[in-house]
Amino acid sequence: MANGYTYEDYQDTAKWLLSHTEQRPQVAVICGSGLGGLVNKLTQAQTFDYSEIPNFPESTVPGHAGRLVFGILNGRACVMMQGRFHMYEGYPFWKVTFPVRVFRLLGVETLVVTNAAGGLNPNFEVGDIMLIRDHINLPGFSGENPLRGPNEERFGVRFPAMSDAYDRDMRQKAHSTWKQMGEQRELQEGTYVMLGGPNFETVAECRLLRNLGADAVGMSTVPEVIVARHCGLRVFGFSLITNKVIMDYESQGKANHEEVLEAGKQAAQKLEQFVSLLMASIPVSGHTG
């Protein structure tokens, strides 16, 4: 099925939010598994449960609280999704990405995406942060794309380019900010590949993905980025490496969601501090920063 939402549905949700808060966000942040603690850094926070927002889907995954939080972070007016939606929850991509178009109508200019991911690159360690340089949309190979169906010209063009999906200037600023933090581990950078889930990958799949050039694997992020770029948002994002994928048939290890959440808890503070510092570097209308 193509998009089940009309332009008016996006408008209605945006109008509802604008009538229930005086805040006007410039930056939207999607918090991945176990990374929702970033909202605790917001000042003047105002929270809405997804269930009370017209047309909003609801998050069903542990580690995803299901709240939309408005507030100020390091001088930037933000709206944060404390919990995202996934294909494996049964949602089509047009529902997964519904909030992104709403953010555009709220006046958001930049989308920051975060996720928990498995490390395919052998140089990555658990707890590393990978700046996303590019992505591979594996579901797209079989026609699963959030832009499938009639194009909504009021958001963007029929055939948007994705070669520059992740903003180069913000990636450079991210490296500078990381150096200022003085972390021992370097900030990684690489390609994120999305699978549908909910099962974790087989050994053969992991080997294939690595051969395709992917550095980290997860079950989210890509559809939101595609829709964000379609409607003209600046995008950058990070993967928190919460486990190293199994590449060896002799290995006794197994990936599990509890491990992902625990690793997220341990490293989340570092990522939250990083995103908070980086927020001041995000250009907004009327500012040069």
UniProtKB/Swiss-Prot annotation:
UniProt keywords, alphabetically: Acetylation, Cytoplasm, Glycosyltransferase, Phosphoprotein, Purine salvage, Transferase
Annotated SUPFAM superfamilies: Purine and uridine phosphorylases
Residues under site feature: Important for substrate specificity: 243
Any single biological process term in GO: purine ribonucleoside salvage
Recorded family membership: Belongs to the PNP/MTAP phosphorylase family.
Its job: Catalyzes the phosphorolytic breakdown of the N-glycosidic bond in the beta-(deoxy)ribonucleoside molecules, with the formation of the corresponding free purine bases and pentose-1-phosphate. Preferentially acts on 6-oxopurine nucleosides including inosine and guanosine.
UniProt-recorded name of the protein: Purine nucleoside phosphorylase
Source organism of the structure: Bos taurus (Bovine)
